[in-house]
Amino acid sequence: LLNINIVNISNLPKTLEENFSEISQESIIRGKVLGWYANTNEQAIYEIANEETEIISKPIYSYTWNEFTEFEKEIETSDGLKFKLSNDDLDLPYILFYPSGETTGAKFTFYNNNQKYNFVLTHGGEFLRIDEF
């Protein structure tokens, strides 16, 4: 007997890489497209209802930033749109996770006065630290 309401994402603090790995696994298990939403305070995962990225009710999972809490956060989506995260509502998914294990991918920049980190989430789901985009 399978309970489709089981959420496999744990509540323990993790790195962003671990979060993305769990979201990818959750999408595969559910057989559904999942959207990753974020602002400066939190990240949330929603099941995507259709191609219009309409969300279904409340988030599957919501969590605070474990890493980079004191950093400005910028995301460049796979279609080249750039966003600086703010405290605004979580109104659009920056990344989609597909049941095939693939993602739409994104580039991330986290920075403050002293440090800057660049990462990329590949279409294949790998999360890599990079020096230059």
Tell what function each PLM region has.
Residues 2, 6-7, 11-14, 25, ...:
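N-terminal helix-rich module
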Residues 22:
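Conserved polar catalytic motif of the HATPase_c/GHKL fold
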